[in-house]
Protein backbone atom coordinates (compact mmCIF):
# COMPACT_ATOMS: atom_id res chain seq x y z
CA UNK A 1 0.00 0.00 0.00
CA UNK A 2 1.29 3.45 -0.92
CA UNK A 3 1.29 5.71 2.14
CA UNK A 4 2.00 9.40 2.66
CA UNK A 5 2.26 10.30 6.34
CA UNK A 6 1.95 13.99 7.23
CA UNK A 7 3.00 15.51 10.52
CA UNK A 8 0.86 18.44 11.69
CA UNK A 9 1.61 20.79 14.55
CA UNK A 10 3.35 23.94 15.71
CA UNK A 11 7.14 24.29 15.76
CA UNK A 12 8.57 22.49 18.77
CA UNK A 13 5.49 20.35 19.43
CA UNK A 14 7.31 17.05 18.83
CA UNK A 15 6.87 16.17 15.16
CA UNK A 16 10.56 15.48 14.49
CA UNK A 17 10.92 13.69 17.84
CA UNK A 18 8.00 11.44 16.88
CA UNK A 19 9.72 10.65 13.58
CA UNK A 20 12.99 9.79 15.37
CA UNK A 21 11.30 7.72 18.09
CA UNK A 22 9.48 5.69 15.44
CA UNK A 23 12.58 5.18 13.26
CA UNK A 24 11.07 7.04 10.32
CA UNK A 25 13.95 9.44 9.63
CA UNK A 26 15.04 7.70 6.43
CA UNK A 27 11.56 8.22 4.97
CA UNK A 28 11.12 11.84 6.06
CA UNK A 29 11.22 15.02 4.04
CA UNK A 30 11.71 17.95 6.40
CA UNK A 31 11.00 21.53 5.39
CA UNK A 32 13.45 22.74 8.06
CA UNK A 33 16.21 20.45 6.81
CA UNK A 34 15.70 21.74 3.27
CA UNK A 35 15.80 25.31 4.62
CA UNK A 36 19.19 24.50 6.17
CA UNK A 37 20.40 23.05 2.88
CA UNK A 38 19.42 26.28 1.11
CA UNK A 39 20.94 28.62 3.71
CA UNK A 40 22.93 28.31 6.93
CA UNK A 41 21.35 29.61 10.15
CA UNK A 42 21.20 33.41 10.25
CA UNK A 43 21.66 35.88 13.09
CA UNK A 44 18.31 37.06 14.43
CA UNK A 45 17.46 40.46 15.90
CA UNK A 46 17.73 38.90 19.38
CA UNK A 47 21.37 37.97 18.72
CA UNK A 48 20.82 34.23 18.36
CA UNK A 49 20.91 32.07 15.26
CA UNK A 50 17.75 30.89 13.55
CA UNK A 51 16.58 29.06 10.46
CA UNK A 52 15.98 31.52 7.64
CA UNK A 53 12.51 31.80 6.14
CA UNK A 54 13.83 33.79 3.15
CA UNK A 55 13.88 30.87 0.71
CA UNK A 56 10.36 29.52 1.09
CA UNK A 57 9.55 29.27 -2.63
CA UNK A 58 12.73 27.32 -3.26
CA UNK A 59 12.28 25.15 -0.15
CA UNK A 60 8.75 24.09 -1.03
CA UNK A 61 9.58 23.65 -4.70
CA UNK A 62 12.41 21.28 -3.75
CA UNK A 63 10.31 19.42 -1.19
CA UNK A 64 7.52 18.81 -3.71
CA UNK A 65 9.98 17.79 -6.44
CA UNK A 66 11.53 15.19 -4.13
CA UNK A 67 8.10 14.09 -2.90
CA UNK A 68 6.88 13.58 -6.45
CA UNK A 69 9.97 11.55 -7.36
CA UNK A 70 9.39 9.31 -4.35
CA UNK A 71 5.68 8.96 -5.06
CA UNK A 72 6.39 8.02 -8.67
CA UNK A 73 8.37 5.08 -7.28
CA UNK A 74 5.61 4.20 -4.80
CA UNK A 75 7.79 4.86 -1.75
CA UNK A 76 6.54 5.40 1.79
CA UNK A 77 7.02 9.12 2.59
CA UNK A 78 6.77 11.16 5.79
CA UNK A 79 6.39 14.95 5.59
CA UNK A 80 7.88 16.79 8.58
CA UNK A 81 6.26 20.23 8.43
CA UNK A 82 3.64 22.24 10.31
CA UNK A 83 0.93 21.61 7.67
CA UNK A 84 -1.15 24.34 9.24
CA UNK A 85 -3.21 25.34 6.21
CA UNK A 86 -5.97 23.31 4.61
CA UNK A 87 -4.88 24.48 1.15
CA UNK A 88 -1.37 23.07 1.77
CA UNK A 89 -2.81 19.71 2.73
CA UNK A 90 -5.07 19.70 -0.33
CA UNK A 91 -1.94 19.83 -2.50
CA UNK A 92 -0.85 16.54 -0.95
CA UNK A 93 -4.33 15.12 -1.61
CA UNK A 94 -4.06 15.98 -5.30
CA UNK A 95 -0.70 14.23 -5.55
CA UNK A 96 -2.02 11.25 -3.59
CA UNK A 97 -4.87 10.86 -6.07
CA UNK A 98 -2.44 11.03 -8.99
CA UNK A 99 -0.11 8.38 -7.53
CA UNK A 100 -2.79 6.27 -5.75
CA UNK A 101 -1.63 6.97 -2.20
CA UNK A 102 -3.42 6.78 1.13
CA UNK A 103 -2.77 9.83 3.33
CA UNK A 104 -2.55 9.80 7.09
CA UNK A 105 -1.90 12.80 9.32
CA UNK A 106 -0.34 12.57 12.77
CA UNK A 107 -2.04 15.56 14.37
CA UNK A 108 -0.23 17.22 17.30
CA UNK A 109 -2.67 20.13 17.59
CA UNK A 110 -4.16 18.71 20.81
CA UNK A 111 -0.84 19.23 22.61
CA UNK A 112 -1.41 22.28 24.85
CA UNK A 113 0.23 25.48 23.62
CA UNK A 114 2.10 25.96 26.92
CA UNK A 115 3.65 22.51 26.54
CA UNK A 116 4.69 23.36 22.99
CA UNK A 117 6.31 26.59 24.22
CA UNK A 118 8.15 24.65 26.93
CA UNK A 119 9.43 22.11 24.39
CA UNK A 120 10.48 24.92 22.06
CA UNK A 121 12.85 26.20 24.75
CA UNK A 122 14.58 22.81 24.92
CA UNK A 123 15.44 22.87 21.21
CA UNK A 124 18.84 24.00 19.93
CA UNK A 125 18.95 27.80 19.74
CA UNK A 126 18.88 27.91 15.95
CA UNK A 127 15.69 25.78 15.89
CA UNK A 128 13.76 27.81 18.45
CA UNK A 129 10.97 30.03 17.20
CA UNK A 130 9.46 33.12 18.87
CA UNK A 131 6.51 32.42 21.18
CA UNK A 132 4.39 34.66 18.96
CA UNK A 133 4.96 32.26 16.06
CA UNK A 134 3.64 29.38 18.15
CA UNK A 135 0.62 31.42 19.25
CA UNK A 136 -0.12 32.38 15.65
CA UNK A 137 0.15 28.76 14.58
CA UNK A 138 -2.30 27.59 17.25
CA UNK A 139 -4.76 30.31 16.18
CA UNK A 140 -4.46 29.06 12.60
CA UNK A 141 -5.06 25.43 13.62
CA UNK A 142 -8.34 26.54 15.20
CA UNK A 143 -9.64 27.65 11.79
CA UNK A 144 -7.85 25.29 9.38
CA UNK A 145 -9.11 21.72 9.38
CA UNK A 146 -7.59 18.52 8.04
CA UNK A 147 -9.33 17.92 4.69
CA UNK A 148 -11.69 15.02 4.20
CA UNK A 149 -9.96 12.00 2.75
CA UNK A 150 -6.94 12.38 5.04
CA UNK A 151 -7.07 10.00 7.99
CA UNK A 152 -6.32 11.81 11.25
CA UNK A 153 -4.14 10.00 13.79
CA UNK A 154 -3.09 11.04 17.27
CA UNK A 155 0.61 10.75 18.17
CA UNK A 156 -0.15 8.07 20.76
CA UNK A 157 -2.05 5.80 18.33
Report each predicted region and the residues it spans.
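Short N-terminal micro-motifs specific to bacterial/archaeal maturation
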Residues: 1, 25, 50, 54, ...
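Conserved GTP-binding G-domain of TRAFAC-class P-loop NTPases and closely related GTPase folds
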Residues: 1-8, 13-17, 21, 25-27, ...
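Charged, low-complexity, helix/coiled-coil-prone segments
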Residues: 1-13, 31-38, 78-85
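Conserved substrate/cofactor phosphate-moiety recognition/catalytic segment
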Residues: 16-75, 114-118
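Glycine-rich loops and low-complexity Gly/Arg-rich segments
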Residues: 30-31, 53-55, 102-105, 129-132
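ATP-dependent NMP and nucleoside kinases share a basic, alpha-helical "lid"
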Residues: 37, 41-42, 83-126, 140
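Glycine-rich phosphate-binding loop used to anchor ATP phosphates in small-molecule kinases
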Residues: 54-103
Amino acid sequence: MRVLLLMRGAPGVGKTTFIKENNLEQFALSADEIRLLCQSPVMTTSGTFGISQDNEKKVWSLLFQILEARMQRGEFVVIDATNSKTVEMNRYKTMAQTYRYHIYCVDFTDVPMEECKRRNLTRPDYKQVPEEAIEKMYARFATQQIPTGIVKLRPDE
